[in-house]
Amino acid sequence: FHKPDGIAGDLGGGSLELFDVKDRNIGAGITMPLGGLRLSDMAGGSLSKAQKIAREHVSKAKLLDAGRGRVFYAVGGTWRNLAKLHMGAVHYPLHVMHEYEIPFAEAVPYLKKVAKGEAANIDGIHTVSKNRQSLLAFGAIALLEVIERMQPRSVMFSALGVREGYLYSLLPEDQQLTDP
């Protein structure tokens, strides 16, 4: 991200990592067992149980208090698919996901719909592969709980992940600075 200022979250299959980020400085982070696969397993596939589990963990994440009014940066495949679905639903004209941004007031009702298991009824569901659709609701639950607690001004999505970040970190600093 170009000059990030907010809280970043990386949702994997087993965990959700949250950390404060400002420019090139990354603050201390926390890990919660809220990855899509793990959340689904812990809840026995129940969306209502998943919401309770996510709310319990997120309510303890004091780190999110520092994000109020800033940006939440969403990283991870399930969250990328939520962005892709939203882009299809609003008929977003560009096929560029990196730094795609949804204002908080728009993100909440969208995520609530997906978290209820209604993704199949959203225009644009065809953009998400069938084998990825089953985790959309669990990813939406985790993201919804995080942003409702944090109250960011918006959610911004990354087209890249940890792998790309690691490769970027291997570049010499002068080369890193040339890439916005």
What are these regions (language model features)?
Residues 1-6, 20-180:
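Helical "lid/coupling" subdomains associated with nucleotide-phosphate turnover
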Residues 12-17, 77:
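Ser/Thr-glycine-rich phosphate-binding loops at phosphate-binding pockets of nucleotides
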